[in-house]
């Protein structure tokens, strides 16, 4: 399935039904009063978040969404039928902006969460509404009002608790496939991963934690280089960052600093996010020429974060690293609960 994480669409709520001009025509009542009913309300456009969608792909093929118009009023003071609301399903994690003003309209993060995007127009008034002591037989009515119309920009930010970040070819896809049932495309060249991949990693308790393999970031990502903005956006909702570094690189410290500088430049608190650093591919390192422990110590001093020596291929060091992930997530959850009750 193709992964689409941005879309622009147009939505239009239904027009209110027209009020009508009608008069009572009953036997023995030759000059009945006005009885034209009001028009029905136009249908609204409502967005709802659902769990079974993972992409905005559907919006690539359909760009205009319109709710039903309200029905015309009827005789005998009957109000027209209301237009049916249009329910638009989006993935959990979808942020909705007004494309013309840039205003944030809503952020749908929970299953079944709903957001009224465009309200239906009010129904027009029938002539019975205008009956008065001065006008006993009004011969006019009002049309229904148009529904709201909006041009929207949709952005999907993945809902993952742990974001795996690093330079291209650091082994992120191999790691997520080792930890979960996810099977991303893996190859021995940079930029194999062009879309984020999600994998569910099970705790010893059986509970699942969602990890996101974020496509490789490059220098200048915060300025948009290499689709950097698109990729960095998916890190915003994560609680923990797992910074993966290729231990076979000719300059591990440079690689670490490159990613950290991009996180700081992008902002939105990414550089302050709880982090774990992992030196990957240690199975491919010549221990006689490379002092991995010394590199780990340097990274620890730089990052002030726990550093692990791992191999995603052989699974060496993965369990201790995961235990640290679970511990940090527990801390974050406890802090969030404390904030709620403060």
From Swiss-Prot:
Species per Swiss-Prot/TrEMBL record: Trichormus variabilis (strain ATCC 29413 / PCC 7937) (Anabaena variabilis)
The organism's place on the tree of life at top rank: Bacteria
Protein name (database record): GTPase Obg
Gene Ontology biological process terms in this record: ribosome biogenesis
Record localization: Cytoplasm
Main location: cytoplasm
Reported cofactor(s): Mg(2+)
Assembly and interaction partners: Monomer.
Keywords, sorted A to Z: Cytoplasm, GTP-binding, Hydrolase, Magnesium, Metal-binding, Nucleotide-binding
GO cellular component terms attached to this protein's record: cytoplasm
Function (record text): An essential GTPase which binds GTP, GDP and possibly (p)ppGpp with moderate affinity, with high nucleotide exchange rates and a fairly low GTP hydrolysis rate. Plays a role in control of the cell cycle, stress response, ribosome biogenesis and in those bacteria that undergo differentiation, in morphogenesis control.
Record EC number: 3.6.5.-
Principal EC category: hydrolase
OBG-type G domain residues: 160-330
UniProt binding sites for Mg(2+): 173, 193
